[in-house]
Amino acid sequence: MAKLTKEEADKLLELISQMGSYGSAESEPDAGFLRRYLPLPEHARALDSQVILVIGDRGAGKTELFRAIQFPAGLQQIRKLAKGGGVPDPSHSAWLVGYSTSGTEYPPELVFREFSKGKQPTDLQLIWLGLLLRCLHRVRSIADLPEAMLDALSPESPLPVLFNRVQQHLESCFASLNRLDGELDRSSKWIFVTYDELDRVSAGDWDQLKTILRGLVQFWSSNCRRWRRLRPKIFLRRDLFNRVALFGPDVSKIAAQRVELVWTPRNLYALSAKRLVNHDLLLRQYFESVMPGGEERGELGWYPTAATEEDYRKLIERMCGKYMGAEPQKGQSFTWIANHLQDGNGQVLPRSIVRFFEGAAEIERQNRKAEWPRLLHHTSMRAAVDQVSVSRVQEIEDEEFPWMKTVRNTLQATHPQVPIERRDLEYLLVIDWSRASEKPPETSGHGLLQLLMELGIFYLRGDGRVDARDLYLKGFGLKRRGGVARPY
């Protein structure tokens, strides 16, 4: 390839800065979605008819997975990765949404929370049964239900009305679903009902969230063997699943057949390579001499088949250089990226690594330091980690844990240095929650720190002190002992 001019280098950086994170899968445009999407064997397992629970953090690719199956080419590629033939034929399958915060078809958080007050999980089983019927009724007629029950299946019908009608016509509701499952079985068809964003049904009230989720899990735990062709897919955040004791034996019945969406470094670099190479012809030309093994797959574009993490080293080093400075002691760029984007549990989200490359490219565009053929200077990469940190913490507050803003404000008031003695951090986390509208499930300093460690924000070192990964330093206003001074 001819040597790039400065203008072409600037164009390459501009393209990398727009490589396709768009903040979240929900906001990505349809055009070119499959060219950015990387189907994985784990995704195929999640579509297996026997898998009920899909565990993954926000940003781990759950939404992308179910967006991909809306495209025939996407579903077909995912099915090719399946082992054992557990993924049903897409032409004989319907995928419905059992709960989502999008649109007006499902109860808003405040309504759900208010309804669940004073209720037991057994009560919530009835409301989830009603919502299942409502979901099915939108796309097909539900046979032999009383007129009063059908009226309650309208999205405009209040939850208390739906609850009361299900109570009154419980046998008819189950009989109708039994008949539907029989019809599906005779015609060799499937209906999958998906439940996502469940943490938002009562994001600000942990007690109500427990009750609501227990109702859903108990309902499907009791009925997943009753219906062979009417199948649920329940997406749970990892921290909710890890608190499995809160759900008792109900989860254990369905947890044996579960899929966990975990991204290995190989898969993260494969995703990055696919997005970069398929984004623009100029980027493909830039990486042409160092591209890992791959093949063209129709609407998916170029698909990386190189099996090991090491296979992607040359591609990353062409863009980022070999070292994070002038000397090897500064660390190798290839391993530095994943190490500095991981949380306290050792996990890296695909959303984070895409934002990292976008951010580093934008920073480099504003102040070019890298020498050709390198595009990203190590200072731009370090600054990009801070950007990812801020956006990740903001995302946690906005989409996952509204109470995390209080934790952030508390830490930013003192900028504690890590590593820190556990008792000292527990003392800092003694917060008066009495006036807070949204509270964490654990409010003592000890309990809150334990929760933050479960979430990967902090982790326990071998010497007993508490530390935080770089992913959360800037976002929470933390400082690292012996590290570069931060201008807080």
Across the structure, where does each feature detected by a protein language model lie?
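A short, basic N-terminal segment
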Residues: 1-52, 72-91
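C-terminal leucine-rich, beta-strand-based interaction scaffolds used for sensing/assembly
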Residues: 2-11, 226, 311-488
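P-loop NTPase nucleotide-binding core
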Residues: 6-9, 50-51, 56-192, 201-207, ...
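Short linear interaction motifs
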Residues: 31-51, 172-175, 213-216, 252-253, ...
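Short, hydrophobic/amphipathic alpha-helical patches that form generic packing surfaces
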Residues: 68-71, 123-138, 270-277, 355-362, ...
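Short secondary-structure boundary/capping segments
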Residues: 69-72, 113-114, 209-211, 247-254, ...
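The catalytic "switch" region of P-loop NTPases
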Residues: 198-330
